[in-house]
């Protein structure tokens, strides 16, 4: 995963001042270079034209579910203690993807968290940029079927959430997709 809990805690303490600054910035903050170059390069970042990095924040904790005022079986009317089946990192990727409809999400990585928010940096590529089109390692992202990657769980965090990093015994109902197996896989 992104980094050990211990390292994460150390980073949070070290970056407390930095996060205080981030909290006052917009939810989607475009930045010039990655905050964690090691993490960025691990998930595919290279400093080239046509590459955009956006830092975003998402609320922490379980699902915020609205109260429904219509009739329900009491057991189905739950609001608290419900965990979303989608990770906060995936939510971050999806929101950034909606914010930049002309770009495509390559990947993302964790950069910090405080009491209320988790901060992620999302790497986006411009599929119409000549440098990306000519790049042998990245030209695949210009193809039509790579549209809406984040929304369809095709990023690294998305694949993890769909269980596709598991294989062998116990993973029989994960492929080709959860939906194909009537969501019995997760």
Region annotations inferred by a language model:
Residues 79-103:
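A short, contiguous, amphipathic alpha-helix enriched in charged residues
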Residues 65-67, 131-138:
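Short, charged, solvent-exposed linker or helix-capping segments at domain edges/interfaces
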Residues 54, 107-128:
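Histidine-centered divalent-metal-coordination microenvironment in nucleic-acid enzymes
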Residues 17-47:
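Long, contiguous juxta-domain segments that are non-catalytic but functionally important
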Residues 1-9, 13:
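Single conserved hydrophobic/aromatic residue that forms the stacking wall/gate
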Residues 139-186:
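Intrinsically disordered, low-complexity terminal/linker regions enriched in Pro/Ser/Gly
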Residues 125, 137-140:
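Compact beta-sheet-dominated globular domain cores
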Residues 42-82:
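A glycine-rich, hydrophobic loop/mini-helix early in the fold
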